[in-house]
Structure formats: structure tokens, C-alpha cells
């Protein structure tokens, strides 16, 4: 319900990872990566399905060996979300997973062998309509670039990326996206800015090895937020030393905060003070867990008193303003009811679910009318 101008996205070409469009104005895709042993098919499939349930558009799977490639075949048969195979050093693994229906190959052309082996992988990708992600990382820069620049710099990451881009250009292959990741926020941001000026391919964003759940989320929000606010980025991954499910949640939270892509409820809640009339923190924590299944975009404000509550409620889908024993409930900016403070969680959950159903039905009718 806010009316700020939308962020102007950088123009880029369009590729597809499975059925997911990437670039050229397509919704920014949110992805994660499994951290199970790929050869443990059951565990990997379960984790991929858990990621899909919280909204993952794409999932990357490490395929370091031929045994892992054979496991990948079984995994691919049991999931519906597009899969990216992460491959280094052995070109034969790339050829094998291509046979098994991989949706995207994450490689660096420079580390999978000589020109003939690179050509074999690219020709296979072209024949099977499989895109490639070039993944440059500050932690694995080529030795000559480390010697040339002394340390990872934006110019070093750009030069590395352009080497790999040139490999694919020489082979007339244009179905690829590029990433230039670093664990340092400023290094990553400046590297992406430079790259965005050099090529028009889709860019995959990430602050690599960002840290644990809290610190990693903060670094990613700052780094990715800066780039996204400048219109840079077509897919993203939040890299956390945590459950991969949290990566998807944080990724969508970043996009929601910038009003780029909405999924689920955007909770607005006060940090509380002695003026709060009900347990705001407990209410928000409970509702975030209970309502994770709702994917309908909604703004829900939960404010403990009348200082800021009415103002936030005016621009929320649903809003609660704390009052003595009963709190005001607003819907689309209009006060509609009063809720008992002692039963706030259950009452709000019921109202939010009802509103989500109402919005879903309205969208369904709109779609039917457009189709007519």
C-alpha cells in the first residue's frame, strides 16, 4: 500500500533454468544449495522438498564425483524444482548430469580442462538447451590474478569473470549467467557493479561464506540490498552456515523489504516499551511460525500502543493497535473491530487467514476475467 516508484531493473538477456525465467525483467529468483551428501539420495531429496515448500525457485546440488552424478539422476527423478549441478575440475561429470536432465550447470570453464573439453561441455549444453552459470569466487581466484593484484580486488574478480565469458563467447554460447561472489560486502558489491557495466547477461547475486544465521543474514541484506536497490541482479542466494531453509526465508525477506517481490506476510512490529498493551513480541514470534504456510503477499502491522499504531495500520493490509484490555483491528486502513488482548494470537491468526483467502479469491476472479 506504499506508493514509492519501483526500482528500475538493469536490462539483461533472458535464459531459462528449467521452467524458471531468468533476466529480462523476470521475477528475481531465490535459490539455495543442499548441504547433504549428494550420495545420500533420501536426505538430499528431503532437503530439496523442504526448500521448495518455503518457496525456493531453484536448488543447487554439489556433484563432486561420478557416484554423486549417479545419485543426482535419482534425485532429479524425485523432485520438481529446477536443479543446478555444481561441478568443478572433471568435465565428464558435467556431461553425465546433462544426460540425467540437469537444468543448469554451474562451472568455471577455466577449471574443467583444455579447450576441447570446454567445447564438449558447451556443445552438450547447447544441444540439450542447458544454461551455464559462471561462478567466480574471491576465495578461488586464478593464481596469476592473485599474483597480478596481490589480493582479491573488484578488478581481479571482473578480469576472472570476463575470461570465462570470453571462453563461452568464442564458442558462440550465450545461455549463461554470471556471479562474482566475495565474503567481503564491499568487494562483492563493487565487483558486481563493474560486471554489470561490462555484460548484459543475467547476474546471480550472493555474498559468499557470509557467516552464521544472524551475521550472514545481515551481510547479505546489506550487500544484496545495495545491488538490488540499484537494479542489479536477476537471481540470488543468501549463503548461511545454517539450515538452507533459512537462506530462502532471508532471501524473500530482502526482496520484500525492497518491494521487489512479495511472498507471504510482511510483519511490521514495534520493538515494544512500557506503553505496550499486549505481548507484541510473543504475538509476532508465534504468528510468524503459525503462518509460514501463507504465500499471499500481505502487510500486517502489530503495534503495542496508540502512538504509532494507527499510522502503521493505515498502510497495512491488517493492523493491530494496542489498547486497554482490547486492541483496535484495522483492515485496509479502516478500523473494523476490537480484539481481546488476552487472546490476541488466536484471533489475529484467524483474521489473517480469512483475509489471505479473500485476497486469493479476488486474484483468482481477476485472472479468470483477464482470460475471458
Swiss-Prot record:
Taxonomic superkingdom: Bacteria
Catalytic activity line of the entry: (2E)-4-hydroxy-3-methylbut-2-enyl diphosphate + oxidized [flavodoxin] + H2O + 2 H(+) = 2-C-methyl-D-erythritol 2,4-cyclic diphosphate + reduced [flavodoxin]
GO molecular function: 4 iron, 4 sulfur cluster binding; 4-hydroxy-3-methylbut-2-en-1-yl diphosphate synthase activity (ferredoxin); 4-hydroxy-3-methylbut-2-enyl-diphosphate synthase activity (flavodoxin); iron ion binding
One GO term (biological process): terpenoid biosynthetic process
Binding note for cofactor: Binds 1 [4Fe-4S] cluster.
Catalytic activity, EC: 1.17.7.3
Keyword Signal: no
Binding, [4Fe-4S] cluster: 270, 273, 305, 312
InterPro entries: Dihydropteroate_synth-like_sf (IPR011005), IspG_bac (IPR016425), IspG_bac-typ (IPR004588), NO2/SO3_Rdtase_4Fe4S_sf (IPR045854)
Positions of transmembrane segments: none
Function as written in the Swiss-Prot or TrEMBL entry: Converts 2C-methyl-D-erythritol 2,4-cyclodiphosphate (ME-2,4cPP) into 1-hydroxy-2-methyl-2-(E)-butenyl 4-diphosphate.
Protein family per UniProt: Belongs to the IspG family.
Name of the protein this chain belongs to: 4-hydroxy-3-methylbut-2-en-1-yl diphosphate synthase (flavodoxin)
Organism field: Salmonella agona (strain SL483)
Gene responsible for this protein: ispG
Amino acid at each position: 500500500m506504499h506508493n514509492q516508484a519501483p526500482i528500475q531493473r538493469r536490462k539483461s538477456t533472458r535464459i531459462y533454468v528449467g521452467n524458471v525465467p531468468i533476466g529480462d525483467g523476470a521475477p528475481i529468483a531465490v535459490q539455495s544449495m543442499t548441504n547433504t551428501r549428494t550420495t545420500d539420495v533420501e536426505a538430499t531429496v528431503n532437503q530439496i522438498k523442504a526448500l521448495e515448500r518455503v518457496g525456493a525457485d531453484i536448488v543447487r546440488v554439489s556433484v563432486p564425483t561420478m557416484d554423486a552424478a549417479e545419485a543426482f539422476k535419482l534425485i532429479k527423478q524425485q523432485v520438481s524444482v529446477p536443479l543446478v549441478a555444481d561441478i568443478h575440475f572433471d568435465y565428464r561429470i558435467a556431461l553425465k548430469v546433462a544426460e540425467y536432465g540437469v537444468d543448469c550447470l554451474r562451472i568455471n570453464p577455466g577449471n574443467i580442462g583444455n579447450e576441447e573439453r570446454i567445447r564438449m561441455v558447451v556443445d552438450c549444453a547447447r544441444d540439450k538447451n542447458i544454461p551455464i552459470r559462471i561462478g567466480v569466487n574471491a576465495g578461488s581466484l586464478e593464481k596469476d590474478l592473485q599474483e597480478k593484484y596481490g589480493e582479491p580486488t573488484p578488478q581481479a574478480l571482473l578480469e576472472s569473470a570476463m575470461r570465462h565469458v570470453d571462453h563461452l563467447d568464442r564458442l558462440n554460447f550465450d545461455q549463461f549467467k554470471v556471479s562474482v561472489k566475495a565474503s567481503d560486502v564491499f568487494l562483492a558489491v563493487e565487483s558486481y557493479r563493474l560486471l554489470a557495466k561490462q555484460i548484459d547477461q543475467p547476474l546471480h547475486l550472493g555474498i559468499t561464506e557470509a557467516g552464521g544465521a544472524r551475521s550472514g543474514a545481515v551481510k547479505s541484506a546489506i550487500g544484496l540490498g545495495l545491488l538490488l536497490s540499484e537494479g542489479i541482479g536477476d537471481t540470488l542466494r543468501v549463503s548461511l552456515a545454517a539450515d538452507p531453509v533459512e537462506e530462502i526465508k532471508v532471501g524473500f525477506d530482502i526482496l520484500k523489504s525492497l518491494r521487489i517481490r512479495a511472498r507471504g506476510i510482511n510483519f511490521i512490529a514495534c520493538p515494544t516499551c512500557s506503553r505496550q498493551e499486549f505481548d507484541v513480541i510473543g504475538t509476532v514470534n508465534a504468528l510468524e511460525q503459525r503462518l509460514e504456510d501463507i504465500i499471499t503477499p500481505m502487510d500486517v502491522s502489530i503495534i503495542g500502543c496508540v502512538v504509532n499504531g494507527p499510522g502503521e495500520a493505515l498502510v497495512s493490509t491488517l493492523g493491530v493497535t494496542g489498547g486497554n484490555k482490547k486492541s483496535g483491528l484495522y483492515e485496509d486502513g479502516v478500523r473494523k473491530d476490537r480484539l481481546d488482548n488476552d487472546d490476541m494470537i488466536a484471533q489475529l491468526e484467524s483474521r489473517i487467514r480469512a483475509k489471505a483467502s479473500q485476497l486469493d479469491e479476488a486474484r483468482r476472479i481477476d485472472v479468470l476475467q483477464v482470460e475471458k
